[in-house]
């Protein structure tokens, strides 16, 4: 039975980058990884209404730099920057090192896979039909430049007794092409019937490598020209129609005996 590989992990070091960018010794690695998971869970709950797509954590020497990608940066910053200062103080208390927080805006939230998944789960929690939510998200993504999108929902859809899986796809979604820019997102909706999982794949085109850019070549004239002969040298028969061609009008013919005499008469 075929299973789907995680699109981001499949493309790491090819066209994707890690969400946690730091190095640690074997004794410290587990603790720092657990710290990153706790920070992401905290930010997900704290900034639930800020439409956060992803969080990148970097650890330079004895510092931490957290970049939050959000489609509503004003909600994260707050009035006169009060909310972000409180957020920075809480992160410093949790991580134990000075923390620098950067906010990056997501220009097109309709084509961000994580934001699409979060939007669908919020609609499911408000008892909106899952088919309507999925098709509306697909239409918005294709309208704003996505080349393909696939959405899959699994669980007790519409409150049925037996859980099932339904998915819809529009456009092209190449999952095993490494140069394909596939954005992947996952979210869970906590409904009264149970948890419904939503997965989203968005295809945004191909990544062109440094040497893969198409080169536009000028059209060349492939017709071979015969080099010119010096003046004053002509082959016999040149200048008459068909005289310089094999099998022409005057080639291969022999004058009939007595033809000149008949023409002179």
Curated annotation (Swiss-Prot):
This is Small ribosomal subunit protein uS3. Belongs to the universal ribosomal protein uS3 family. GO terms for biological process: translation. Pfam families: KH_2 (PF07650), Ribosomal_S3_C (PF00189). It comes from Cupriavidus necator (strain ATCC 17699 / DSM 428 / KCTC 22496 / NCIMB 10442 / H16 / Stanier 337). Residues 39-107 form the KH type-2 domain. Gene3D superfamilies: 3.30.300.20, Ribosomal protein S3, C-terminal domain (3.30.1140.32). It comes from the Bacteria. One of its GO terms (cellular component) is cytosolic small ribosomal subunit. InterPro entries: KH_dom (IPR004087), KH_dom-like_a/b (IPR015946), KH_dom_type_2 (IPR004044), KH_sf_prok-type (IPR009019), Ribosomal_S3_C_sf (IPR036419), Ribosomal_uS3_bac-typ (IPR005704), Ribosomal_uS3_C (IPR001351), Ribosomal_uS3_CS (IPR018280). Residues 240-251 have a biased composition (Gly residues). Part of the 30S ribosomal subunit. Forms a tight complex with proteins S10 and S14. PROSITE patterns: KH_TYPE_2 (PS50823), RIBOSOMAL_S3 (PS00548). CDD domains: KH-II_30S_S3 (cd02412). Keywords: Ribonucleoprotein, Ribosomal protein, RNA-binding, rRNA-binding. One of its GO terms (molecular function) is structural constituent of ribosome. The keyword Transport does not apply. Binds the lower part of the 30S subunit head. Binds mRNA in the 70S ribosome, positioning it for translation. Residues 221-239 have a biased composition (Basic and acidic residues). Residues 211-265 are annotated as: Disordered.
